[in-house]
Amino acid sequence: MLSRLLKEHQGKQTERKEAQEKRRKDAIAAATTLTEALVDHLNVGVAQAYVNQRKLDHEVKTLQTQAAQFAKQTTQWISLVENFNQALKEIGDVENWARSIEKDMRIIATALEYVYKGQLQPSAS
């Protein structure tokens, strides 16, 4: 009887150990699965952040290139406008010069006219 109780006790202990070992393995498997799921979830976020960062870097590079082109084009436009402004000033200078010459020519023509008329009047008398 004692031997039978000992065997039963040992059998129950073995069953408990096996059940406990099974639960421990199940807990380890569940913890591993949870850890993998958390890592995968975090990796998705990190991967998305990396992709977004690459897109932003590309956009920044494109924007810098376009800004440089715009600055160059703006400089060219400013140069053209300054050249045009200078040409307009020169045209204005030529116009003023032409008016001055025209005024001088009228004065000379008037003086010559008076001289011519002055020469005609004494000889006609």
Swiss-Prot record:
One of its GO terms (molecular function) is protein-lysine-acetyltransferase activity. It is found in: Mitochondrion intermembrane space; Mitochondrion matrix; Cytoplasm, Cytosol; Lysosome membrane. Residues 1-24 are annotated as: Disordered. Residues 1-25 form a coiled coil. It is an enzyme of class 2 (transferase). The keyword Cell inner membrane does not apply. GO terms for biological process: aerobic respiration; anterograde axonal transport; anterograde synaptic vesicle transport; lysosome localization; neuron projection development; peptidyl-lysine acetylation. Disulfide bonds: none annotated. Keywords: Coiled coil, Cytoplasm, Lysosome, Membrane, Mitochondrion, Transferase. The keyword Cytoplasm applies. GO terms for cellular component: axon cytoplasm; BLOC-1 complex; BORC complex; cytosol; lysosomal membrane; mitochondrial intermembrane space; mitochondrial matrix. InterPro entries: BLOC1S1. Its EC number is 2.3.1.-. It comes from the Eukaryota. It catalyses: L-lysyl-[protein] + acetyl-CoA = N(6)-acetyl-L-lysyl-[protein] + CoA + H(+). Component of the BLOC-1 complex, a complex that is required for normal biogenesis of lysosome-related organelles (LRO), such as platelet dense granules and melanosomes. May also play a role in intracellular vesicle trafficking. As part of a BORC-like complex may play a role in lysosomes movement and localization at the cell periphery. Associated with the cytosolic face of lysosomes, this complex may couple lysosomes to microtubule plus-end-directed kinesin motor. Acts as a protein acetyltransferase. May negatively regulate aerobic respiration through mitochondrial protein lysine-acetylation. PANTHER family: BIOGENESIS OF LYSOSOME-RELATED ORGANELLES COMPLEX 1 SUBUNIT 1, BLOC-1 COMPLEX SUBUNIT 1. Belongs to the BLOC1S1 family. Component of the biogenesis of lysosome-related organelles complex 1 (BLOC-1). This is Biogenesis of lysosome-related organelles complex 1 subunit 1.
